[in-house]
Structures are given as structure tokens and as C-alpha cells.
């Protein structure tokens, strides 16, 4: 959709061609890691005004007070206290604190799935339970987090190392192993496109608006012989653009 030479977003490109999707072209994330971005996304806090998320309302709570059912399907967080992953704990104590979560969500999923399509089956089950016509549904996908090869099922593998040019757009010469990593990332993007397409299919006959925010970017052997990103709050705008 944004000029990448390989077909990583066939579903969303199809929606755009049909005039059903309107891509934003000038959007900057407030952070390049999930927790900080979600602090600002779910609240009325502002990066520009340097306000804290906990000093403003969280928008799902406003929907609840307005009479909406608010359903949350999260595939990045486990809901057991035994998980000691620091990022998992930050999200869990932010959105899923026992005192806060009931004010935000009518329903949260109890299970985490190997792949994001598991959330769709969970949604289908809950869709039969909640009949309120006024509903806010949030999907928090695992997306394209490392390790990329773990973010799509084997049958969704579309690209191989042979699909990836030897030289990156910056002129970096990539080994075959590095091109395989890029192919894994591209496959994760393409699988994510499939999941988002299935969400759109479920909303097609409803009076609904779908807003999709893509995963934070990753440097995948573009400018250096490495992949991933720096978890740093002090970032330039260019470093956060998709």
C-alpha cells in the first residue's frame, strides 16, 4: 500500500482499490514500543503537552458510560500473574488491573493464541453473547513482533529468501540468511493483512467504522546488518514514521 515492491498487503490494497479504505499518509507514532504508545492511544494524554495518561480519562471507559458494550481481544498480553515479562506486566497493570479493567471493558479474552486468527474465533463466540447494537470492539494483535517466523502459520508462508533482492534500497548487500529474515517479516506482514481482512469481512454487513493502526516498524536489514528496533523514548519523527 505504501510503495513496498512485494505484495505484502493484498487484502488492504483490494479494499483501497474498491474505495472502501482510506490510508493515512502523514502519521507519527508517539513511541516505537507498544506500552508507551498504548498509554497515549487509550487516553487523552498528549505527547505535545507532556500530560500523563493516568491524569486523563481512558476512552473505553467513556464508551462504557455511554452505554456501549466494550470488547477487548488482546493477543499480546497473558492474564496470569506468573508471567514475569516486563512488557507484558506493564500492559497488564495498565489496562487489566482488577480495579480498572471492569470500568473499561465488558469482556476481555481469557486465552492467548499462537497466531492472531485465534482472536477471530474468540470474537465469533462472543458475538453471539453480546447483542447490544452499540459496541466498541478492540483487537490488539501480536502483529509482526520478533521473532517474525513465529508470527504466521506455515501455510501462510508466501515469500522465501529468493523473493528478496540481494541489495536493500539503501544499497546494503544482504546474505541469504538475512534475506530469509526479511522474507519472514514480509510473510508476517502478509498474514497480518489476512487477519485484518477477516476483521473487515465480519464488519461488512454491520453499521460499523473500522480504524486500523499498523504495528510499530522494525529495521529489518535495511541500513545495517541487524533487525529489530531500539526501545528509546527519545526518538525523531522520521524514526517513528511507517
Describe every region a protein language model picked out.
Residues 1-242:
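Catalytic domains that recognize anionic headgroups
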Amino acid at each position: 500500500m505504501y510503495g513496498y515492491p512485494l505484495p505484502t498487503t493484498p487484502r488492504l490494497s483490494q479494499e483501497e482499490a474498491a474505495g472502501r479504505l482510506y490510508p493515512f499518509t502523514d502519521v507519527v507514532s508517539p513511541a516505537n514500543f507498544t506500552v508507551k504508545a498504548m498509554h497515549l492511544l487509550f487516553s487523552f494524554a498528549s505527547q505535545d503537552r507532556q500530560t500523563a495518561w493516568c491524569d486523563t480519562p481512558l476512552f473505553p471507559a467513556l464508551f462504557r458510560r455511554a452505554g456501549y458494550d466494550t470488547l477487548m481481544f488482546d493477543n499480546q498480553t497473558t492474564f496470569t500473574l506468573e508471567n514475569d515479562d516486563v512488557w507484558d506486566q506493564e500492559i497488564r497493570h495498565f489496562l487489566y488491573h482488577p480495579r480498572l479493567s471492569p470500568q473499561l471493558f465488558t469482556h476481555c479474552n481469557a486465552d492467548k493464541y499462537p497466531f492472531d486468527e485465534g482472536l477471530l474465533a474468540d470474537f465469533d463466540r462472543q458475538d453471539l453473547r453480546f447483542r447490544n447494537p452499540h459496541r466498541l470492539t478492540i483487537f490488539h494483535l501480536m502483529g509482526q513482533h520478533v521473532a517474525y517466523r513465529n508470527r504466521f502459520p506455515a501455510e501462510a508462508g508466501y515469500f522465501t529468501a529468493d523473493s528478496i533482492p540481494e541489495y536493500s534500497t539503501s544499497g546494503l548487500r544482504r546474505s541469504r540468511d538475512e534475506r530469509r529474515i526479511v522474507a519472514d517479516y514480509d510473510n508476517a506482514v502478509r498474514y497480518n493483512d489476512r487477519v485484518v481482512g477477516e476483521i473487515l469481512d465480519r464488519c461488512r454487513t454491520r453499521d460499523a467504522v473500522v480504524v486500523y493502526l499498523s504495528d510499530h516498524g522494525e529495521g529489518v536489514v535495511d541500513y545495517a546488518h541487524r533487525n529489530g528496533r531500539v526501545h528509546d523514548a527519545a526518538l525523531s519523527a522520521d524514526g517513528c514514521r511507517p
